[in-house]
Amino acid sequence: MYKKAGFFKRREVLKDANFLDLTPLPMHGHEMEEGGTVRVLIPRFQGKLSEKILQPRLKSPYIKLSLDELGSAVWQACDGKQNVRTICHKMRQQMGEKIEPAEDRITRFLSNLYNKDLIIFREILKEQ
């Protein structure tokens, strides 16, 4: 969906940023599972040649990553309009005591998604 930024560019932009003020955007699509959780669809191949040669031998063109209840709610809230602080407040209202400490858990989860190139922050896109 979005162009990946290089390691040094991402690091430069986020060096002085407050994580709660960043606006996350998903880089991949998703599908809903039966229980209401989200399954993220990560493309198996990036290059056209490998996709053309190897894809016909495989069942699915995607690697499917299933998220738990909290992860699913946060993934759905990452719409590019809400910053992390707003998402934390929304999750606290939606899940109550089950999510506490909300800021720590959600920022750690989004940091992991960002490090695995599953999300990007709008502020990085503005700098490109």
Regions found by a protein language model. Name each.
Residues 1-47:
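Hydrophobic packing positions characteristic
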Residues 1-20, 56-128:
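Long, charge-rich, low-complexity alpha-helical segments
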Residues 39-40, 44-63:
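Intrinsically disordered, low-complexity serine/threonine- and proline-rich regulatory segments
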